[in-house]
Amino acid sequence: MYINYLKDLIGFKSVTPESNLAIEYIDDLLKKHGFKTEIKIFGDSKSEQVTNLYAVYGNGKPNICFVGHVDVVPAGDYHLWHNSAPFKANEQDGKIYGRGVVDMKGAIACFLTAALDLIKNNPDFKGSISFLLTSDEEGKAKHGTKEMLQYIYDQEYKIDFAVVGEPTCETEIGDTIKIGRRGSVNFKLNIEGLVGHVAYPHKANNPLSCLIKILNELINIKFDEGTEFFQSSNLEVTNIDVGNNTSNVIPASVEAYFNIRFNNLHNAETLGQLIEQIVKRYCKEYKVDYKLEYISAAESFIQNPNDKIKDFADIVESTLKIKPKFSTSGGTSDARFVKNYCSLVEFGLLSEMAHKINEYTKISDLQKLYDVYYNFLMEMLTNK
């Protein structure tokens, strides 16, 4: 059934923050199979409204929860897609194409099927199965999983272990389980100089001269050597804007944007202080004014592999005959919110095709993912 569910889900053009009825589809499906469900819409204005779903079957412990998102990134130029239809599932040559198939509607379809099969085959299982889904993971992530977790805990629901269906695997299904994530902090630096003619530099103050010095030092910072589970922290410059299209004018100001992805040896505040010291030193030397802003998108986190995490890894190995590695690589995810409530793993399809034109997954990979999810639920809820 996971293929049918996946094809249906691809058909919903659920570009962040729109659910576009994808969550309502899942809500109806789970209700028909005896789940208690609740849809909540959070957001300060209509343009920011986010649709969220919590659904649970059973009332015992442990409560194993699948956490995911139905929203997808924009499809780009439709003409570059097979059949020019990114929101219509296209099955060919043992693959399924469509926006969101990898990130992460394929994982949702597999866990839906695994959960419903377990309920059908083991009606007296011990514990609970639940789903927490949002339409705002690819965007600001402000009114999605974070708020929904707080809401369900206020309603006295408790999750004992979560599986987040992000595409984690690298070259084959089963090779990677995420148990943490790097942090991310974005910087915006504005430097104010003095506009002038390039022939009279002594009558101007070029803010680019200062910025070049600053960025040169920043990109050469060796933040750390990495840790057991984390790669080294790194800074990337993402944009420089002077608003100057002429070659004979020294610009009045310049803006630069850069991002740091950091491990658990740092936090956003200490990194902000470090960057501020460097910027302040050069701006004083060049006698220019500056404004530095930074916004933390996420702090880093790491979990010690506890028994449930190890159990999940054992299920992956016994099911797929491959020993998974624990990793923290990649971008941020909603796991950063879930970890405040329970232990978790992130495990899904191959990450290579996520967000790309002609995003696809092999049908055989869907079967492998389903097998892992089903066997894990069996292990946790039936001991068979």
Swiss-Prot record:
S-S pairs: none
Catalyses which reaction(s): N-succinyl-(2S,6S)-2,6-diaminopimelate + H2O = (2S,6S)-2,6-diaminopimelate + succinate
Record EC number: 3.5.1.18
GO-annotated molecular function: acetylornithine deacetylase activity; cobalt ion binding; succinyl-diaminopimelate desuccinylase activity; zinc ion binding
One of the Pfam families matching this protein, by short name: M20_dimer
Keyword match Membrane: no
Entry keyword annotation includes Zinc: yes
Residue sites binding Zn(2+) 2 per the record: 103, 138, 355
Record keywords: Amino-acid biosynthesis, Cobalt, Diaminopimelate biosynthesis, Hydrolase, Lysine biosynthesis, Metal-binding, Zinc
HAMAP family attached to this UniProt entry: DapE
Subunit structure: Homodimer.
Family the entry assigns: Belongs to the peptidase M20A family. DapE subfamily.
Protein name (record): Succinyl-diaminopimelate desuccinylase
Organism: Rickettsia canadensis (strain McKiel)
Lineage of the species this protein comes from: Bacteria, Pseudomonadati, Pseudomonadota, Alphaproteobacteria, Rickettsiales
